[in-house]
Amino acid sequence: MTGATQAKLWYSWWLELPLPKEHLTVMQFLRTLARFFVAVQLLPALEGGEETLVGGQAVLEGVMMRSPHAWAIACRKPSGEVSTHSEPLERLSEKHKWMGWPVLRGVMTLGHAMTLGFRALKFSANVALDELQSPAEEGAPQKKKLEISGWIAAVNIVFSVGFFIFMYKFLPLLATTELKRVNPVFGQQVVFNLVDGLIRLALFLLFIWGTSLWKDIRRVYQYHGAEHKTVFAFEDGNSLDTATVQGYSTYHPRCGTSFLMTVMIISIFVYMLFPVTTFWARFAIRIVLLPVITGLSYEIIRFAAKHRGSLFALMTAPGLWLQRITTQPPEDAQAECAIVALDHAMSLEKQRGGELVIA
């Protein structure tokens, strides 16, 4: 047995450890929080990378779908029932024209998508927690509802931002700086930023691969595949039934995974344009330029989607390859959740006077 196989078995065993019955509810609550935290880290990879006609996101045991003016979420309860929720949605580029400007629109779209995605994840986590709570006996005081409270969500956001900065900004920069001390060749502007980018990419791929070993997150990746299949069926104008949806691919060019990979690649070249030499100056540049890199990556994704044979389209190819991990073939019940979510979003869209036409 190889070391990698042993590590995978140990990791899977630890995450799926059988629990004593008397501690089951508490530990399931903590496990749900852990799933919620990991899913928040994966949020950009699970989200769509554009403000499109129809898009979506995988959540815990469910799928969120959005149309131009509505969004809906469908989550599978442990009982087998599907819990749904839908709300109207304002399209940013229609509300504020300046939000549709090139580069800036990418930053605003991602921020809006992340906010909506976090709300969807919180809803799905609360659905899972609701099933853990047994009903109060007749005459007994009402039990406090198990849910992701405001302070838990706030701590999660702060921790997630800190994790992102430490994992993908601080650590690669620190490692490359230490390599520069070992060999001066790593101090050259091009070499330094190239190595820094490769380390950052390696950490990202390691994180994605590591999360895929956890059964709960593998199911999130299956729902991600269900979301892609359903969007493909809708874009082709086909009926939204399980058999039809299952006939489509799980790999979608506008996936957030492709967007993240583009961000990783573009950042290498952008950092090369700023010849700062001290550690903290380089670190500051990486934080300050994050919105610019996000906006540029968004424009490249848009251009590549319209010009499939261009050089920019090749830059999005690694994201499609990575979807072999972040999307998995869904079960019929998972595809059904994606269909229900899209149906609810479409119904609300029509109620608000919207009309979706596939050209």
Predicted regions mapped to residue ranges:
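Membrane-interface starts of transmembrane alpha-helices
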Residues: 148-156, 184-199, 278-285, 289, ...
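Juxtamembrane "helix exit" motif at the C-terminal ends of alpha-helical transmembrane segments
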Residues: 123-127, 160-185, 263-285, 294, ...
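Tryptophan (W) side chains
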Residues: 10-14
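Hydrophobic alpha-helical membrane-embedded segments
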Residues: 70, 98-123, 196-221, 293-306
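Select subsegments of transmembrane alpha-helices in polytopic membrane proteins
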Residues: 150-168, 252-263
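Divalent-cation
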Residues: 20-137
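Polar-ligand-bearing catalytic/cofactor-coordination segments
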Residues: 34, 45-55, 59, 63-65, ...
